[in-house]
Amino acid sequence: MITLLHIDTSARRTDNDVKEYNSISKSLAAHFMDKWITLNSKDKVIYRDLGLNPPDFISQDWIAAVFTPDEKQSEEQKSLLTLSDTLIDEVDQADIIVISSPMYNYGMPAVLKAWFDQVVRINKTFTFDLARGDFPIEPIMSGKKLILISSSGEFGFEIGGIREKMNYLAPHVETASKYLGVEEFYEIKSEYQEFADARHEESLSNAYRGVEELVKQLV
């Protein structure tokens, strides 16, 4: 049995009366999870919808608590870190992390950035040692896979694409996830949403097909 951590980040739901208002990234991620559980019914799923339940932004007091040794933390500091501890525990349990995310202003939604800020934490998910020279940070966890399921209004954000340099979503997620022990990164994406034309329909169909192919590849 393996554990999957499924994280949705869109501000949109998937049950709107108007179909066009539904979140594409959430719908694709739900399709991934449905296909996975159909083939692996005994696997454990941990679910978080950050769009509906956004994590707290970190603060100066939070940072101070993080850099205070556990045995010296006040009760107030321990309380400040309760959410972070919970989220890190979920990451620690996960073999596979599935993150669905729209591209907002060419990057990740604020709720996803807030989640990363809560979980990428010194002495919990990474260590820092200047004896390592110019690369002092190393992850504590290892062996995890991450699937980013994304949607965007425009297109061409892939390597070599016409908007490659405008893509601050996938590269950011991939880079930050390394400090959560992620060693394999996959992305499935739907593009052209704002154009609402045949290209979007084809991209969305390809994304659904890509979901099914990736599930078969990973099981």
Curated annotation (Swiss-Prot):
Tell me the keywords, alphabetical order. Answer: Flavoprotein, FMN, NAD, Oxidoreductase
What's the top EC group for this one? oxidoreductase
Q: What is its EC number?
A: 1.6.5.-, 1.7.1.17
Which PANTHER family would you find in this protein's record?
Answer: FMN-DEPENDENT NADH-AZOREDUCTASE 1, FMN-DEPENDENT NADH:QUINONE OXIDOREDUCTASE
Biological role: Quinone reductase that provides resistance to thiol-specific stress caused by electrophilic quinones. Also exhibits azoreductase activity. Catalyzes the reductive cleavage of the azo bond in aromatic azo compounds to the corresponding amines.
HAMAP family associated with the record: Azoreductase_type1
Provide the protein name. Answer: FMN-dependent NADH:quinone oxidoreductase 2
- Gene source species: Colwellia psychrerythraea (strain 34H / ATCC BAA-681)
